[in-house]
Design a protein with these regions (language model features):
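Bacterial N-terminal signal peptides that target proteins for export
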Residues: 1-9
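Bacterial N-terminal signal peptides
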Residues: 8-17
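Sec/Tat signal peptide C-region and signal peptidase I cleavage site
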Residues: 18-24
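Alpha-helical segments with a strong preference for the paired helices of cellulosomal dockerin domains
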Residues: 25-26, 32-59, 112, 136-143
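A short glycine-rich, aromatic-capped structural motif
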Residues: 69-120, 134-136, 212-213
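Functional-site microenvironments in short loops/helix caps that host divalent-cation chemistry
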Residues: 132-261, 270-272
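Short, structured beta-strand segments at or near domain termini in extracellular proteins/domains
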Residues: 271-280
Length: 280
């Protein structure tokens, strides 16, 4: 009986005696689920964390700004600037200034509100990501959106996309955007056969949804081999014949949905598994 009591008491003692640093940089003293009390649920979450090294909830509160275009609202998440390695060989180091990125992919609803058309191959739920849009189409959409809002929206650069996907300064270095388990954060070929409504899987460390799976996402950059060295706010090659897209889709195997995967095609190309998200 004494051993059992000690086992139950020890996690509570550790929680109260030692602050726990979460990936959000906050120090919590026991109330891990932020419900105002320290309970057995908090003890369980601590034990799960110690065993898995993956926090059971996301205490980080993203700084979100909401914009509206013709009655349709969408959110942009602030990404604090930082420095990271773009490749896996420590040859390409990137420093980024602070920027914002779409909390979700651009939806059919937002596209229709701005353009008055719906090019998507998949219909149904209007909160599905728009697809069947080329890079050129995205530029036309952004021009009209900026006229409506008075803002300066754009596509993210590949570096901005990658930094946001990996969790920015709060990164846990997951293979996928927000988890080592793709099924938690992504719609891909094993759990979907078409696009799905945005933000129905778990977000990543920054509170951003669907950066892996659902639809591939256009980036601003021309495609080219990564350079070597350290760069600040890189824009990619000055010229090219194809544009970068990232993230994988509902049509992709897990291996194509990793944060590091990159692909490219001509800016006029349209398919039903590629869309985009905004940057600002």
């Amino acid at each position: 009986m004494k051993k059992c009591t000690l086992f139950l008491f020890l996690p509570v003692f550790l929680m109260l005696a030692f602050p726990i640093k979460t990936f959000a940089g906050d120090y919590l003293r026991g109330d891990n689920n932020e419900d105002g009390t320290v309970s057995i649920a908090d003890v369980t979450s601590l034990i799960d964390y110690l065993l898995s090294n993956e926090w059971p909830n996301n205490p980080f509160k993203p700084e979100v700004t909401t914009f509206t275009a013709n009655g349709v609202s969408f959110n942009m998440v602030k990404i604090e600037g930082g420095t990271f390695w773009m490749d896996h060989s420590d040859n390409y180091k990137v420093s980024l200034s602070t920027y914002s990125i779409g909390q979700t992919e651009v939806t059919r609803m937002l596209w229709y509100a701005v353009m008055g058309t719906d090019p998507s191959g998949f219909k149904g739920d209007l909160t599905r990501p728009v697809e069947m849009v080329s890079w050129d189409d995205c530029q036309q959409f952004i021009t009209k959106l900026n006229s409506l809002t008075g803002q300066h929206f754009r596509l993210p650069t590949e570096a901005e996309w990658a930094f946001a996907a990996c969790g920015g300064n709060l990164s846990h270095n997951y293979v996928y955007a927000g988890s080592e388990d793709i099924s938690i954060v992504a719609w891909y070929e094993e759990n979907a056969n078409e696009t799905q409504p945005v933000a129905t899987k778990a977000p990543n460390e920054l509170g951003i949804y669907d950066m892996c799976g659902n639809v591939w996402e256009w980036c601003q950059d021309w495609y080219g081999e990564y350079p070597s060295g350290t760069y600040t706010n890189p824009q990619g090659p000055e010229t090219g014949t194809s544009r970068v897209f990232k993230g994988g889709s509902w049509h992709s195997p897990a291996s194509n949905c990793t944060i590091g995967t990159r692909s490219h095609t001509g800016p006029e190309n349209q398919v039903n598994h590629r869309g985009f998200r905004l940057a600002l």
